[in-house]
Amino acid sequence: MKSLSLLRYLAIAIIVLLLDQLSKWSALSNLQMGIPEPVLPFMNWLLLFNPGTAFSFLAQGSGWQRWFFTVLGLAASIYIIWMLYKSQSDKLLCIALSLILGGALGNVLDRVMYGAVVDFIDLHYANWHWPAFNIADSAICVGAALIIWGELRKSFGKSAQSH
């Protein structure tokens, strides 16, 4: 039974990975580097390569960050798979970890194939732009938010029971 549940959570990660890679393939096929394509009043498609990490942190490195973040992403993925195996009774946590796993693998694949992560979603208000991101980044953020929400629910549940 445990392996069937694990397969379900791994399927979520694979779906995230496929959606991420298909969206990046579309961006690479249809967008020109650095030229915004308006989609909505607050959103552009904007093809960029990010050799760093979130918010382009360490993007100016000499190239070491490609393999460092690749190894880090693979190590995190192995740990997440182990966590999925051990935590199957907590469905919210497993869904969150599956989203993070799919996103991490999507960005690792980019680093291996392109030497950088492919970003293409540009949210903005007037002249202020949020750093460009992708589906993998979104899945990682949603997964992290679900983990925080789950922990807060547990914490407040325990607090309410003790009063």
Swiss-Prot record:
What's in the GO CC field? plasma membrane
InterPro entries recorded for this chain?
Answer: Peptidase_A8
Origin superkingdom: Bacteria
Active site location: 119, 137
- Residue intervals passing through the bilayer: 9-29, 39-59, 67-87, 92-112, 130-150
Write out the catalysed reaction. Answer: Release of signal peptides from bacterial membrane prolipoproteins. Hydrolyzes -Xaa-Yaa-Zaa-|-(S,diacylglyceryl)Cys-, in which Xaa is hydrophobic (preferably Leu), and Yaa (Ala or Ser) and Zaa (Gly or Ala) have small, neutral side chains
Q: Name one GO biological process term.
A: proteolysis
Lipid bilayer topology: Multi-pass membrane protein
GO molecular-function annotation terms?
aspartic-type endopeptidase activity
- EC annotation? 3.4.23.36
Question: Which UniProt keyword terms apply here?
Answer: Aspartyl protease, Cell inner membrane, Cell membrane, Hydrolase, Membrane, Protease, Transmembrane, Transmembrane helix
| Pathway(s) where this gene product acts | Protein modification; lipoprotein biosynthesis (signal peptide cleavage)
Q: Which cellular compartments is it found in? A: Cell inner membrane
For this chain, the family text in UniProt reads:
Belongs to the peptidase A8 family.
Protein function: This protein specifically catalyzes the removal of signal peptides from prolipoproteins.
The name under which this protein is listed is Lipoprotein signal peptidase
The gene for this chain is lspA
